[in-house]
Amino acid sequence: LCIDAASDWALTCVEQLPHQNHHVLIDYGAADGGTAVGLWNQVLDHLHTHQPHAHLTLIGNDLPSNDNVALAANLALQIPRPPKPTVLVSARSFYEPTTAPGTVSFGFSATAMHWLSQSPGPLPRHTHVLASGDAEALERFTAQAMQDWTAILELRSRELQVGGRLLTVNLSRDEEGRYLGHNGGKTRNVHDQLHQIWRELADEGAISEEQYRNGTVLNFYKSPEEFMAPLKDPTSAPYRHGLRLVDERTVHVSCPYRKRWNDDGNTAAFAAGLMATIRSWSRHSFASSAGDAAADAVFQRLEQRIADAPSEWSLDYVEHHQMMERVA
């Protein structure tokens, strides 16, 4: 759903690329690439329609620890279709260079760049900084997030060719302070629920106090102004390398699991599905601190909480879409 909501801007980006013999397109932080197959079908078709003689290369990027075999397989689904692109995997962090300078025509990233490159320090009384109420920690996490974002944009500005476009779809924080897991109080704050379960495990002695303190979700949902800031600062590295803001918007996407539950009333399926998607992005934070058994306990209890009060749960998305161009 998050990727689908950005498909119109992705098509606009490739439609406006300069005509040339070869284009490189890259998906940064692609995971296994499965959710983006449809988007890349559209993008490649659209670019091929506008530039039928250009050869297209599609690169999927993610960490070396990613399931890059699955990523390669999903990229390969594009090969039999016109325009029969070359497909490659770049198994590096997007906090590093991923291609040669000045080679990328269109860069895209969806729901990946909210993860921090390193810990900004302890979060002693919660598992997520935005739900913690800890002003000092918020200042540290914000500084790290902005340092990381500026570094990411500098790297992408170097990789883009002049006239190339970059489209980022990032989990965000809107003007009312809503973000993934917090929809303004319409339902429970997911991050508070995770923290309550984590605190329970510590109180029961299942994890130590040190493990409790280390169980921090190391991501940060930036505001639109924070996303745009490096592109409004002429002294920033991405700005000096020619990266400019073309357009931006905030998009809200309602929880698909909650919608399905509203329609069919299947509480067990709702609890299992919602738990699984929350687990997909938060489990590592708990397992790396206290091991697999403790992490498994978190999500067993989470699923039970959802099943006990399904009307009080919904994982609604707040996304920021940012379209950029390298002009020089």
What do these predicted ranges mean?
Residues 262, 267-328:
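C-terminal target-recognition/interaction regions appended to catalytic cores
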Residues 111-112, 231:
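Short catalytic micro-motifs in class I SAM-dependent methyltransferases
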Residues 162-291:
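Substrate-binding/catalytic lobe of Class I Rossmann-like enzymes that use SAM or dcSAM, i.e.
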Residues 114, 122-162:
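A short glycine-rich, Lys/Arg-flanked "PGG" loop and its adjoining helix->strand segment in the class I
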Residues 1-87, 91-102, 115-133, 168-176, ...:
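N-terminal charged/capping segments associated with class I S-adenosyl-L-methionine
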Residues 4, 30-38, 52, 139, ...:
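Intrinsic disorder
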Residues 1-16, 90-93, 142-155, 223-233:
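A Trp-anchored, charged/polar loop motif used as the substrate-binding/catalytic surface
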Residues 108:
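A conserved beta-strand element that flanks and buttresses the S-adenosyl-L-methionine
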